[in-house]
């Protein structure tokens, strides 16, 4: 056998080995300025992730298709519903639906047989999907302007609204902007507007980055396992205001909400970070700015006896006038670095094998 230099061997080993460029163990840094680099390191594009993604996702990304939508014409379709219906059931390719700026007054459902869809708005422009469904008309979770049942969904640079009026106390006024009931979904620079039950983060692993979510009561609810990064949570109006109603129902369920480097704002006072809608909710806020609108007690037991012993409500290194723990309810978890770390990684949403950055417009 001929002589092969060690440098050549090293070269061959590097280029023959699988490239693992995302990790489920690297925590989001405490320094907000380091978020872009953390994201760039851990959420690289498909072209640099071959051999590390879910096989079905990798195959889909290798066969991308683009569909254009413009209400004014000059595109493949004039409505989003027409574009979605054009995608065959059993779809196996990444289909990027590029929406021209404008207001699309449509109620849209992406069914389970159409995975790998991306809804892409133009950065810096206003692309709005809006409808006015209510619980009285459709039932609570079916009232959403956008409902997604299909895996590997993405949305970027979109505003999703439910324009039904703010409900009166005691009325059946739930009106969702979005329901995500599918695994492995990501949202980038999206805005969700509604009042009660704005975002049904219903089921599956989800990632939200650079988003804005607005509502009144339980405006993020469901049983998703979700990581919210650099997202503003804004409560509107006065009276009882609650951000989360996380729906975990047993200690063995692997779901919950984590808010990292987020900001809690509002127009009223006394906002609760969450309430015990179900018996075992799990919600963590880390490195999050809490303005004076946050209720000093922080969390609401919802008059369910015994739930104070089964909830997991954690806060870690939050700041601002609403972040002080002295007056928090006794079941608030003032967690330490070791306890919070699992909530700060992509491992919380099993993200290293499916999470991809948004495509360019």
Swiss-Prot record:
Active site located where?
197 (proton donor), 218 (nucleophile)
- Family annotation (InterPro entries): Pectin_lyas_fold, Pectin_lyase_fold/virulence, Pectinesterase_cat
Q: Which UniProt keywords are listed?
A: Aspartyl esterase, Cell wall, Cell wall biogenesis/degradation, Hydrolase, Secreted, Signal
* Pfam families linked: Pectinesterase (PF01095)
GO molecular function per UniProt:
pectinesterase activity
Which EC class is this protein assigned? hydrolase
Question: Which is a Gene Ontology cellular component entry for this protein?
Answer: extracellular region
What does the entry state regarding organ or tissue expression?
Expressed in flower buds.
Provide the E.C. number(s) assigned to this enzyme: 3.1.1.11
Q: Where is the signal peptide?
A: 1-22
The Gene Ontology biological process terms listed for this entry are:
cell wall modification; pectin catabolic process
User: Any transmembrane segments, and where?
Assistant: none
Name where it's found.
Secreted, Cell wall
Query: Which residue positions hold the site described Transition state stabilizer?
Result: 196
Biological pathway: Glycan metabolism; pectin degradation; 2-dehydro-3-deoxy-D-gluconate from pectin: step 1/5
This enzyme catalyses: [(1->4)-alpha-D-galacturonosyl methyl ester](n) + n H2O = [(1->4)-alpha-D-galacturonosyl](n) + n methanol + n H(+)
Primary location group = secreted
Positions that bind substrate? 174, 275, 277
Function according to Swiss-Prot or TrEMBL: Acts in the modification of cell walls via demethylesterification of cell wall pectin.
Q: Which family does it belong to?
A: Belongs to the pectinesterase family.
Q: What is this protein called?
A: Probable pectinesterase 50
This chain's source organism reads Arabidopsis thaliana
Gene from which this protein is expressed: PME50
């Amino acid at each position: 056998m001929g002589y092969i230099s060690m440098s050549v061997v090293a070269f061959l080993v590097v280029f023959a080995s699988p490239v693992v460029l995302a990790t489920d163990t690297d925590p989001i840094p405490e320094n907000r300025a380091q978020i872009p680099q953390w994201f760039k390191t851990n959420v690289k594009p498909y072209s640099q992730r071959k051999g590390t993604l879910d096989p079905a996702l990798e195959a889909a990304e290798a066969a991308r298709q683009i569909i254009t939508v413009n209400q004014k014409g000059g595109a493949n379709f004039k409505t989003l519903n027409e574009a979605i219906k054009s995608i065959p059931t059993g779809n196996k390719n990444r289909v990027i639906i590029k929406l021209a700026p404008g207001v699309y007054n449509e109620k849209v459902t992406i069914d389970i047989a159409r995975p790998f869809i991306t809804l892409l708005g133009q950065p810096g422009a206003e692309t709005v999907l809006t409808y006015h469904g209510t619980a009285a008309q459709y039932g609570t979770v079916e009232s959403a302007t956008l409902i997604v049942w299909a895996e590997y969904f993405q949305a970027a640079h979109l505003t999703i609204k439910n324009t039904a009026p703010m409900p009166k106390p005691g009325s059946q006024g739930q009106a969702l902007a979005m329901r995500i009931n599918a695994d492995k979904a990501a949202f980038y620079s999206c805005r969700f507007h509604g009042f009660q039950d704005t975002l049904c983060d219903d089921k599956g692993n989800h990632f939200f980055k650079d988003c804005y979510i607005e509502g009144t009561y339980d405006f993020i609810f469901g049983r998703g396992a979700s990581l919210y990064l650099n997202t503003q949570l804004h409560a509107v109006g006065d009276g009882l205001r609650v951000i989360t109603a996380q729906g975990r129902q047993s200690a063995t369920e692997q779901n919950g909400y984590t808010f990292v480097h987020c900001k809690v704002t509002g127009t009223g006072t006394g906002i609760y970070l969450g309430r015990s809608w179900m018996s075992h909710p799990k919600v963590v806020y880390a490195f999050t700015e809490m303005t004076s609108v946050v209720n000093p007690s922080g969390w609401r037991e919802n008059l369910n006896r015994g739930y104070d012993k089964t909830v997991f409500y954690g806060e870690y290194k939050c700041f601002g006038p609403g972040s002080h723990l002295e007056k928090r309810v006794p079941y608030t978890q003032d967690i330490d670095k070791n306890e919070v770390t699992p909530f700060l990684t992509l491992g919380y949403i099993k993200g290293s094998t499916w999470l991809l950055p948004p495509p360019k417009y």
